[in-house]
Amino acid sequence: MQGSLISSEIAEPYAQALLSVAQSSGQLEAIGGEIKSLLELLENAPDLRAFIGNPVIKEEAKKAVLSQVMGSSANPYLTNFMMLLVDKRRIQFLEPVCQQYLTLARVLTNTVLAEVSSATELNDSQKQIVIDKVKTLTGANVVELKTKVDGSLIGGVVIKVGSQVFDASIRGQLQRLSLSLR
């Protein structure tokens, strides 16, 4: 818990700085898209995460690897920002900074992230129904969906938006029925 608090205190100002640059350059969405890709890469490449977070590895080596990972088509603001994190010895906070950037960008654009668990993969029309329902419930302009399949739900969906959970699953209905029969 303590590490998480320290991490968020460090991440917040860096994320705000990147957001400010993205806003002033009109690249809020472009940088956000690259950050999502970067977070996905870090999630799927634990060796890369360990490499950039290792304090023993020299900054120049980290910069070289990050430049190679980002490629020549990467947004220069994001690439320069990551090099700044290396220079300031804050690169180990890259993931929390990126997460905080996305959170701040969502607030700025009145966007909500809806984490949807369903028994089977949702098709496009089902996703649109969920998006419309979340917009109605939250008043958001835009809804980002993060979907995952959870076979234990039996049927239906569970939607998590921030700290709110909307359980429209068969498993949830059975649990509520079980509680009412006690």
Curated annotation (Swiss-Prot):
Subcellular localization: Cellular thylakoid membrane
Cellular-component GO terms for this entry: plasma membrane-derived thylakoid membrane; proton-transporting ATP synthase complex
Protein keywords: ATP synthesis, CF(1), Hydrogen ion transport, Ion transport, Membrane, Thylakoid, Transport
KW Transcription regulation (keyword) present: no
MF (Gene Ontology): proton-transporting ATP synthase activity, rotational mechanism
Membrane-related topology note: Peripheral membrane protein
Pfam families hit by this protein: OSCP
Function summary: F(1)F(0) ATP synthase produces ATP from ADP in the presence of a proton or sodium gradient. F-type ATPases consist of two structural domains, F(1) containing the extramembraneous catalytic core and F(0) containing the membrane proton channel, linked together by a central stalk and a peripheral stalk. During catalysis, ATP synthesis in the catalytic domain of F(1) is coupled via a rotary mechanism of the central stalk subunits to proton translocation. This protein is part of the stalk that links CF(0) to CF(1). It either transmits conformational changes from CF(0) to CF(1) or is implicated in proton conduction.
Family: Belongs to the ATPase delta chain family.
Oligomeric form and interacting partners: F-type ATPases have 2 components, F(1) - the catalytic core - and F(0) - the membrane proton channel. F(1) has five subunits: alpha(3), beta(3), gamma(1), delta(1), epsilon(1). CF(0) has four main subunits: a(1), b(1), b'(1) and c(10-14). The alpha and beta chains form an alternating ring which encloses part of the gamma chain. F(1) is attached to F(0) by a central stalk formed by the gamma and epsilon chains, while a peripheral stalk is formed by the delta, b and b' chains.
Protein name per UniProt: ATP synthase subunit delta
